[in-house]
Amino acid sequence: MTHIISMERLEETVFRSGGSGDNWHMTWAEDDLQYVGLCDGQGWPEMAGYVRKERGYNSRIYAIRGDPPDIRFIHLPGFPDLLSEEAPNVNRYYGFGIIALGSCIYQFLSTPNHPFTSGPDPRFVGAKLIYSQDLGKSWLNQDGSPVHWEPWAARSRANMVFLNEPGETFSLLTVVQMGRNYQHNRDGYVYVCAPNGNVEGSMNQLVMFRAPRERLLERASYEFFVSRRRDGSARWSSDISARGSVHTFPAGWVNTKLHPYAWHPSVTYNAPLGLYLMANWGMGCDANGMWFGKPSYLGFWIAPNPWGPWEQVHEETAWMPEGDANARAYQPQICPRWIAEDGKPFWLAYTDFQPQQPRYCFNCQKVLIRTR
């Protein structure tokens, strides 16, 4: 595994796409497009086929063509509308983990326990799995039926791939990326990671499951990481209660006000350097535990395997793109198509929670890796 000396965000390269939205989990498909999830935004009005919605989209998928700064977002008309609604937000989901395998695209959408604006202790407690067999032209539920956005009362383990699991684990999912069309995968498994819960002490623990790539729709095929052996190989179990922690992130970066939201990673195989690269973030809280009270934590880690062991190679306890002390950056996403041929520069997408435009949008910045 390549030895990394340092990493640097290149401030002069910050690119803001316009439009609005956040989170930006993405995958690189066989058609050479990246497919990206948007949450809570209007998208890009200049897109062909764009239809403005009064309150915007709760969650949607778009395609991306090109390289920064010359990129174009592509509207996918076949994605079922999931709109931001007035309270009580009857159909609210958040599209996060995504993976392209051949002509199929799979996406995990996280479900809260109830609308964030009503009821006590709002938090993410599960995930719905949908998929497309034709690179985003049409979409199906996990059971093969047309996508239906179940309202709160209708969500159950019959239609959610995870729901109210032990410790509320596997509610914020990230799929490990391995190049265009998953081409760098060698063992036939898809790897998915997540925070282990919703409170300090569990949310900063990383857990993982794997599934054969042809059986990702079958919850019964999932194996959960238990531990690493001395030789670096992993123990797996079909019992979610036997899960172990892949890695533990620093304490003190989980909010207690509004819904807990932190330590939701991005993991991508960097083929030129022969290592897995992870970006992750912690929530900057004020003295009362309110989210976005100060700049976020940003870190990068590397590992020889998806299950680690993970070594930290970069840390910022005040993540401030362009040196802006008002920045409230979050959800760093390693863009899998935008890794250079030598693996050293790559592009990192993120959102900034500052209310003014153009920061609440698809921002990206080049990051430079220095090696020995």
Predicted regions and their residues:
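Blade-level signature of beta-propeller repeat domains, shared across WD40, Kelch, NHL, RCC1
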Residues: 334-372
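Active-site cradle of extracellular carbohydrate-active enzymes
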Residues: 144-160, 186-305, 314-320
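Conserved blade-ending motifs and adjacent loop-strand segments that build the rim/top face
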Residues: 307-339
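Asp-box/BNR beta-propeller loop motif
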Residues: 66-71, 130-141, 214-215, 303-312, ...
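Long, hydrophobic, well-ordered secondary-structure blocks that form the structural core
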Residues: 102-210
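Structural signature of eukaryotic scaffold interfaces centered on beta-propeller domains
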Residues: 16-31, 86-106, 113-115, 161-188, ...
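Short glycine/acidic-enriched loop and turn motifs that connect beta-strands
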Residues: 41-46, 112-116, 197-201, 283-287, ...
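Beta-propeller domains
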Residues: 1-17, 27-90, 109-154, 294
